[in-house]
């Protein structure tokens, strides 16, 4: 019977499954897996190489070594399949069963599983509520544990040392049980009543008040409940039977010379078997306790080492002094099972070779070497040869191919025709790193690549290699052609702009072609059409740059798709009219009629794609490339040393700078400036000198004087080769030319500080030894940085992909009414990013109204295309609420409307698009372009720090935002609020400029007044912070007592005396509680109230503030009462580049974060402690006050009696995203993270669409903490998926809604907190994740991409999405049928059925 079952088991291999569950294996389950017990440590016989019986490679247990042949050779061949040989006991079957049949070892004494013991938090420890140290002492036979206290004073689980045990024995005899080792722990676990324990803890939870105890109890409840729910038994954490891995998964290979190469696991298993057998023998002999104990301890250690070597104590090493690789090491880390074999496999039908340029290829083609193609397409060739009758058998075909007969090459051509291949360049940082091409057979051994796809691959031809993969099945070929073909990937998924853009030679060629020159041959001609222009150029009658008039025919495409032709005579050049011949119909001539640089060419392709669509764009791109190459060759551009022109002014500029530096040096020596100021000033002088030299140099290079036809001097843009290359954007930049022809400038030391002696020479003049030595620092640092950067950037991408991998578009519309408000990004006086770029391709969340009227311009749920954006710009809208992924209400996915446009395709995103992975790639791919450094503020940066006024750049109207202000006696506005900002808007109400206004700034214009450009609108003292009165009256001193709370000082230079308030730390004794303040009173001595409130005007003076008023002085509103010097807030380093992006996505709390107001109310200060101030916020509605202790050195932005709103900044500093989420909500934190990340990328000139960052933010916000679970299955304080709470809340009445607070998790935490344990385990901390999941019997729904890749099926995205949807429907159907069939049988029917069955059975008997 068993054999029959076994046979059925082997045949029925394909198992359809929907979920995967991980749990603890009971001893019975382990025995059911096993095909026999392993009793001996032997492996194979060294002479015969046959496996030993009952050993680790036993053929009787694991199966035959040769296919269909038993070990002794009695039964051979297929006809005996399934027979079990009576001589050697081996079943005759395939040898591959040795990969799947397991064995087992019956342990003589139970041993604890190290994962559940040592993986923190220790599961056994938590369950037993015993410290880990105590459990370890019991397990490793150092102490006893009481398993049953009986009627004695001993408690269960009490730890006894050897002496205490003997004493207890004397005292109580055998009234109690105490044991040591894993048996003891196993017994305690077995006797636990989980349900009862759980109820007791829950009762205790209600009674307890201590926070730490509460946390611990909650953890225990969760663990015990997961045991109850999953059906795992606690005693299974102690092993009594050890499963043994199939032998072919831990191979033993004979090497020549009689030695063996073996897997480390065999050593580890051998140790366990040896010790186990010895222990059995000792127990049979009834050996002394101490010996048995030692043997048991050694067995426990051997099992530990097998499961996870090195987790406890020293790792066991092999003969080569290296730690042995245990089972845990097999699955974790980069070389482990998950990352090495499941997520990244090597594939068949692939090859790699060096790439060279294929300038004659079309965009969808690549050159494939014949040798390579022959090898890759072998099976296809064999098939074709057989079908066409050239070969009778496959073997013959094989021979023909080996001989490389001529017919083979013809067949190869046929096979390859329209069969796309995929080219991949490592590192594949985004999806454009693999694209499909049609192969063209070429001679040679290098793959030829189309130059325009180099940008997407980030490839160059300096020895890069690429891999070729052949899609085999029809579906694969179809997908390669429809989705991956290079012609279908013209736009970048990161920002929606063309990625197929010409660079280098092509750009230079087009630039040269479209330049004009005065006084060229053929200037002033009138030509009938571009064809004639080309003819004249070819025959040498006119030059390429000659200014001529040409009759041009333009074709315009109207709204109704009709094409209108218009003919004009246009001033242009010969070159531009030749270029016009390749521009597709439908584009305006103005696109070509200018000097074309890299930006304008990209713009031209973009316009072409939006107006004409894919096909014309692809052909246009190819034509641009051919033309560009051709004219770059004709231009004969090359760089010579004479092209590097050094400006004449250079020496003078440097002399002046040296003179200024010597002046500063003198000032320093006479003590007028400090060392730091001197250093900063010197660096500033040199930096500006460098700028001046660069300006002079560029002026010199970029303009040449020429004499025109009338004999007059004229200036025109220069034809200097170096300038042309930089100006066109082909290669090089102003900064590089500056090093060639200007001066190299300031260099940095290895620690990042700037060396104050600059390199005044350039490369044309050459450097002297010292200058050369200084410049080596920078060069080396650059190389070291690059290596670091690549690793860090790769790790960031990996974390991003992991956190977002399961986010897929799953429905069309989630019908949400929420969204986020978009405004243009304005910093200071310039628009960094206009609104159209931020909202293009998004869906409108609520109707956009025409300002001032109530007509709807754009209706809700409209996808904003280029046309709509132009319309919005025309109507001067500068604020739109758009749908966003963050506010999308789809559970386990996102809806298409909230995501908007698929950037790489230009239409609304399709269902099944893996937007999470695309977002992660878009953010991670440019990571290598970011800097690694933290900026130390010095020199140039310190000048920016102290702005003291605002000078506007545009004409417009002044608008103050959330500004409280008073008007002083000079009729100026004085700002008295913290977050005031000032906007300049144009006559249509669009924001042109935006500035922050500090407290105490004087504003020269009132709200709504007009202002002209260049006017100074506001000014303030950047070095002090004033305290300003909002009322007029007379001053009365309170608690201002000389030498107790204040001191009087006189300024040495001016002779003016002033009062300085002492800090609390400087006061003595009783004076510490005095609170110096200024009260404002009227003539009658009564309090004056703050405007609009009933709070008396009283201003408290913080320590170190300076007063220049006397008691009783008359003051007016807007006057300064006291000043605080701001010099104390030291300069902090700014983290920039990659580390900053990583910090934001990991949601790290800054070191000294800004302190925000937790509630709205009035500020006051309570009793101080030694180093801290007590800040009290009293709500206006009279509910509970909020208190917070703030360190004294923190500079506070608020004064006593001031009113703050929830989330206002109380003390400056970098804001913590967690605080923003808690106090200002999801929208604010989204906006914060998006803007901060964009700032870093914008600095490097990298464009990424906001929605990608929003996708990652959505994943960071996917968890929430339950505040009160009401009647639901959730515990208070439990962290769970936000979508689960949303589902629960949608299904309950409004009174029973669950209260929760959203959590912001960093991307690493969020990846590990995913519901899928397979995904989490393959990411990081494999052991911990698997331990946790096994205990709670987790079920993996296989929702994400990663899990499905690991179990080896189609991913639920893209073309695999429909397959998974189908399976889901089938599953639902099955479930409903199952339910209905269960429900339809009544009780009578059931009893009837039973009677019938019994009758039938009786009759049979």
UniProtKB/Swiss-Prot annotation:
Its cofactor is Mg(2+); Zn(2+). Zn(2+) 1 binds at residues 70, 72, 85, 88. Its EC number is 2.7.7.6. Zn(2+) 2 binds at residues 814, 888, 895, 898. GO terms for molecular function: DNA binding; DNA-directed RNA polymerase activity; magnesium ion binding; zinc ion binding. Belongs to the RNA polymerase beta' chain family. GO terms for cellular component: DNA-directed RNA polymerase complex. This is DNA-directed RNA polymerase subunit beta'. GO terms for biological process: DNA-templated transcription. Gene3D superfamilies: 1.10.132.30, 1.10.150.390, 1.10.1790.20, 1.10.40.90, 2.40.40.20, 2.40.50.100, RNA polymerase II, clamp domain, RNA polymerase Rpb1, domain 3. The RNAP catalytic core consists of 2 alpha, 1 beta, 1 beta' and 1 omega subunit. When a sigma factor is associated with the core the holoenzyme is formed, which can initiate transcription. It comes from Wigglesworthia glossinidia brevipalpis. Binds 1 Mg(2+) ion per subunit. Keywords: DNA-directed RNA polymerase, Magnesium, Metal-binding, Nucleotidyltransferase, Transcription, Transferase, Zinc.
């Amino acid at each position: 019977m068993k054999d029959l079952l076994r046979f059925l088991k082997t045949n029925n291999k394909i198992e359809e499954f929907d979920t995967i569950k991980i749990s603890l294996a009971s001893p019975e389950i382990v025995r059911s897996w096993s095909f026999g017990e392993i009793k001996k440590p032997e492996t194979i016989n060294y002479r015969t190489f046959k496996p030993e019986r009952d050993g680790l490679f036993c053929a009787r247990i694991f199966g035959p070594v040769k296919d269909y042949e038993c070990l002794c050779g009695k039964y051979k061949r297929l006809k005996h399949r399934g027979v079990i040989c009576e001589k050697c006991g081996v079943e005759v079957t395939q040898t591959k069963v040795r990969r799947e049949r397991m064995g087992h070892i019956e342990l003589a004494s139970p041993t604890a599983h190290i994962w559940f013991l040592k993986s923190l938090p220790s599961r056994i420890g938590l369950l037993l509520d015993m410290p880990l140290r105590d459990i370890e002492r019991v397990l490793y036979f150092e102490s006893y544990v009481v398993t049953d206290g009986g009627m004695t004073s001993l408690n269960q689980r009490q730890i006894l040392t050897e002496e205490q045990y003997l004493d207890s024995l004397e005292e109580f005899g055998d009234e109690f049980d105490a044991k040591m080792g894993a048996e003891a722990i196993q017994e305690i676990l077995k006797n636990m009543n989980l349900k009862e324990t759980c109820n007791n803890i829950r009762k205790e939870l209600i009674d307890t008040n201590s926070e730490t105890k509460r946390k611990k109890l909650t953890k225990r409840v969760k663990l015990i409940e997961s045991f109850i729910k999953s059906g795992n038994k606690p005693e299974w954490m102690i092993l009594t039977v050890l499963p043994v891995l199939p032998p072919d998964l831990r191979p033993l290979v004979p090497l020549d010379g009689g030695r063996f190469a073996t897997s480390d696991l065999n050593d580890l298993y051998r140790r366990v078997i040896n010790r186990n057998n010895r222990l059995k023998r000792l127990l049979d002999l009834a050996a002394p306790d101490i010996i048995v104990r030692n043997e048991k301890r050694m067995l426990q250690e051997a099992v530990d080492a097998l499961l996870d070597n090195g987790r406890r104590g020293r790792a066991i090493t092999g003969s080569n002094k290296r730690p042995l690789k245990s089972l845990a090491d097999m699955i974790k880390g980069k070389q482990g099972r998950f990352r090495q074999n499941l997520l990244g496999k090597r594939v068949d039908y692939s090859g790699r070779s060096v790439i060279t340029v294929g300038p004659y290829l079309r965009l969808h083609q690549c050159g494939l070497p014949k040798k390579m193609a022959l090898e890759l397409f072998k099976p296809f060739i064999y098939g074709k040869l057989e079908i066409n009758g050239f070969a009778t058998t496959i073997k013959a075909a094989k021979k023909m191919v080996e001989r490389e007969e001529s017919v083979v090459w013809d067949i190869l051509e046929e096979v390859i025709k329209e069969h796309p291949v995929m080219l991949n360049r490592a590192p594949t940082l985004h999806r454009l790193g693999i694209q499909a091409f049609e192969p063209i057979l070429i001679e040679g051994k290098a793959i030829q690549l189309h130059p325009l796809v180099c940008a997407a691959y980030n490839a160059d031809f300096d020895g890069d290699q690429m891999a070729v993969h052949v899609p085999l099945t029809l579906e694969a070929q179809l997908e390669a052609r429809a989705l991956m073909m290079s012609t279908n990937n013209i736009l970048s998924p990161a920002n929606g702009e063309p990625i197929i853009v010409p660079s280098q030679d092509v750009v230079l060629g087009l630039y040269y072609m479209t330049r004009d020159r005065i006084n060229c041959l053929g200037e002033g001609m009138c030509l009938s059409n571009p064809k004639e222009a080309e003819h004249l150029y070819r025959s040498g009658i006119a030059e390429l740059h000659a200014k001529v008039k040409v009759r041009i025919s333009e074709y315009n495409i109207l709204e109704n798709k009709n094409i209108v032709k218009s003919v004009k005579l246009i001033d242009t050049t010969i070159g531009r009219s030749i270029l016009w011949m390749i521009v597709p119909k439908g584009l305006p001539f103005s696109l070509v009629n200018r000097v074309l640089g890299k930006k304008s060419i990209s713009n031209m392709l973009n316009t072409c794609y939006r107006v004409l669509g894919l096909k014309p764009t692809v052909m246009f791109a190819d034509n641009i490339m051919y033309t560009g190459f051709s004219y770059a060759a004709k231009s004969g551009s090359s760089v010579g040393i004479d092209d590097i022109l050094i400006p004449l002014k250079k020496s003078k500029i440097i002399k002046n700078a040296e003179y200024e530096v010597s002046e500063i040096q003198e000032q320093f020596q006479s003590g007028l400036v400090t060392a730091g100021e001197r250093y900063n000033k010197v660096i500033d002088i040199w930096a500006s000198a460098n700028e001046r030299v660069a300006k002079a140099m560029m002026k010199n290079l970029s303009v040449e004087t020429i004499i025109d036809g009338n004999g007059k001097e004229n200036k025109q843009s220069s034809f200097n080769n170096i300038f042309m290359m930089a100006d066109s954007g082909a290669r090089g930049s102003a900064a590089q030319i500056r090093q060639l022809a200007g001066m190299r400038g300031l260099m940095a030391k290895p620690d990042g500080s700037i060396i104050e002696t600059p390199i005044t020479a350039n490369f044309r003049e050459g450097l002297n030894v010292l200058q050369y030595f200084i410049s080596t620092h920078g060069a080396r640092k650059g190389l070291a940085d690059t290596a670091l950067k690549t690793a860090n950037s790769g790790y960031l991408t990996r974390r991003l992909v992991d956190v977002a991998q399961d986010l897929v578009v799953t429905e069309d519309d989630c019908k949400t009414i929420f969204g986020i408000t978009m405004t243009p990004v304005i910093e200071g006086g310039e628009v960094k990013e206009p609104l159209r770029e931020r909202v293009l391709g998004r869906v409108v969340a609520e109707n956009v109204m025409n300002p001032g009227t109530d007509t709807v311009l754009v209706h809700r749920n409209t996808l904003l295309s280029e046309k709509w954006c132009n319309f919005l710009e025309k109507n001067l809208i500068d604020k739109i609420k758009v749908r966003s992924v963050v506010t999308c209400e789809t559970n386990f996915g996102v809806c298409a409307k909230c995501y908007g446009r698929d950037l790489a395709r230009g239409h609304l995103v399709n269902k099944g698009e893996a937007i999470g992975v695309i977002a992660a790639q878009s953010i991670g791919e440019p990571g290598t372009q970011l800097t690694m450094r933290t900026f130390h503020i010095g020199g140039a940066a310190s000048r920016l720090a102290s702005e003291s006024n605002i000078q506007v750049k545009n004409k417009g109207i002044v608008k103050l935002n959330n500004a409280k202000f008073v008007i002083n006696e000079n009729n100026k506005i004085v700002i008295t609020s913290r977050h005031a900002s000032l906007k300049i808007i144009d006559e249509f109400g669009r924001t042109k400029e935006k500035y922050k206004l500090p407290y105490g700034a004087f504003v020269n214009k009132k709200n709504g007044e007009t202002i002209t450009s260049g006017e100074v609108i506001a000014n303030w003292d950047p070095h002090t912070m004033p305290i300003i009165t909002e009322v007029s009256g007379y001053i009365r001193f309170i608690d201002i007592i000389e030498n107790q709370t204040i001191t009087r000082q006189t300024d040495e230079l001016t002779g003016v005396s002033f009062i300085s308030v002492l800090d609390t730390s400087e006061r003595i004794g009783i004076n510490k509680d005095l609170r110096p303040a200024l009260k404002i009173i009227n003539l009658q001595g009564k309090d004056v109230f703050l405007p609009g409130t009933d709070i008396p005007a009283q201003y408290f003076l913080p320590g170190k503030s300076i007063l220049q008023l006397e008691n009783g002085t008359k003051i007016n509103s807007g006057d300064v009462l006291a000043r605080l010097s701001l010099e104390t807030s030291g300069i902090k380093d700014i983290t920039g580049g990659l580390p900053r992006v990583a910090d934001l996505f990991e949601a790290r709390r800054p070191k000294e974060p800004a302190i925000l107001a937790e509630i709205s109310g009035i500020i006051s200060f309570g009793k101080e402690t030694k180093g801290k101030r007590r800040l009290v916020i009293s709500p206006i509605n009279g509910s509970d006050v909020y208190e917070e202790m703030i360190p004294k050195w923190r500079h506070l932005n608020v004064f006593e009696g001031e009113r703050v709103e929830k989330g206002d900044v109380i003390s400056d500093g970098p804001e913590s995203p967690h605080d923003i989420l808690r106090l200002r909500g999801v929208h604010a934190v989204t906006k914060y993270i998006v803007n901060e990340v964009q700032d870093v990328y914008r600095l490097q000139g990298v464009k990424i669409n906001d929605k990608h960052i929003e996708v990652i933010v959505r994943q960071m916000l996917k968890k929430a903490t339950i505040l009160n679970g009401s009647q639901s299955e959730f515990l208070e304080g439990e962290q769970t998926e936000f979508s689960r709470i949303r589902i629960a809340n949608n299904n309950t009445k409004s009174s029973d809604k669950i209260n929760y607070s959203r959590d912001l998790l960093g991307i690493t935490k969020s990846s590990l907190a995913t519901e899928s344990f397979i995904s989490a385990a393959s990411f990081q901390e494999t052991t911990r994740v698997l331990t946790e999941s096994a205990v709670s019997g987790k079920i993996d729904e296989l929702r994400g991409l990663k899990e499905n890749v690991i179990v080896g099926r189609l991913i639920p995205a893209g073309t695999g999405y429909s397959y998974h949807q189908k399976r889901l429907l089938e599953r639902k159907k099955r479930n409903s049928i199952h339910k209905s069939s269960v429900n339809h049988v009544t009780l009578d029917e059931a009893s009837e059925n039973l009677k019938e069955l019994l009758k039938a059975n009786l009759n049979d008997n």
